[in-house]
Amino acid sequence: MIDYKMILLPFLISVVLTPLVKQYSIYCGAYAKENKRTVHHGKISRIGGVAIYLAFIITMAIFVKADRQIKGLVIGSSIMFFTGLIDDLIDIKPLVKLTLEVIAALVLIYFGISVDIIRLPLGIQIDTGIISFIFTIIWVAGITNAVNLIDGLDGLSGGMSVIVLVVIGSIAIIERRSDLLSIAFILAFGTLGFLVYNAHPASIFMGDCGSLFLGFMISAISLLGFKSSTILTLALPILLLMLPIIDTLSAILRRTLKGMKFMEADKSHIHHLLMRQFGHRNTVIIMCGLTALFGLSAFAYMINRNIGFLVMVIILLAVEIFIEKSAMISEKFHPLIGLWHRIQRKSRKIFKKVG
């Protein structure tokens, strides 16, 4: 079912192109500037996403038949890639970037990539109608920005994206979706080739052109793979992307409570908090490991709902406890730990009365 030439080619293209992109970007001044939020030193290229994009496009052109949905996928992802590239080179306003994300989502809808029908148990079907339109835009913009926000450490966004794409591809094998398998694995191995140079200490960054492209592709592939499906399968991409989703929602809540703008950057993301205690390389390993666990729970959920749900709950509880302990949202935000303390106090009172 898997054509090994199809996954080897994007890897090799990315491995060959990335050093060329690095040399060109340093020559033309497209390198990351040091500031209070960065964790790197020196001039490092920030348009490594060019290699990932070209590896994907070239391989798709050779191996994948361009039907209507594939055309929508390529056009929409190209809009996001060039949006990120322009932002990497000259900076664009957040509102302009968001507008272009909406346009890219509309392209997907036009080419038939959206959730039109949700099938519930007992044969019940819900025609989403206009809700499908809204859901697709929110989903695409949300996941695209979630992957973009998590791109703060060497190899983090790329590593997590590879894991998510491999899991989606593995699920596609079970579902006998050769089209989905091809797209997911081509993108995964193209990204893997880039990670050869992006692993800590990175000699090149993927930049917004890479993270926006990957985020958009993951959101689009998820819609393409779980279109017109049950609530169970619709939950799978959410489960796979749980870590960046949690990080994004925490950032929104944190910045709202502090009176900051949503697009205003800070150093309170999950990876920043972990790095203070575990260091750069170990933080990336932990984050990718958690993503793999979420992927495992998604895979287990397809095979056995009870086991998958149990794994998911345990991981979510661990992440929530970390968020509260690290004051990621606010020093006063600790509902789960607070609940546990209240239960402990009431238990002591009950035991004292019994005693």
Locate predicted features.
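"…together with the soluble PPM/PP2C metallo-phosphatase catalytic core" -> "…together
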Residues: 1-248
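Canonical bilayer-spanning transmembrane alpha-helix
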Residues: 221-222, 292-297
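Cytosolic, membrane-interface loops and tails of multi-pass inner-membrane proteins
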Residues: 20-45, 250-281, 347-354
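Membrane-interface capping segments at transmembrane-helix boundaries
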Residues: 23-27, 256, 322-339
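Long, low-complexity, intrinsically disordered cytosolic termini of multi-pass membrane proteins
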Residues: 333-355
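Extracellular/periplasmic helix-loop-helix junctions in multi-pass membrane proteins
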Residues: 296-314
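N-terminal hydrophobic signal/anchor transmembrane helix of membrane proteins
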Residues: 223-230, 315-332
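Alpha-helical transmembrane segments of integral membrane proteins
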Residues: 268, 277-293, 302
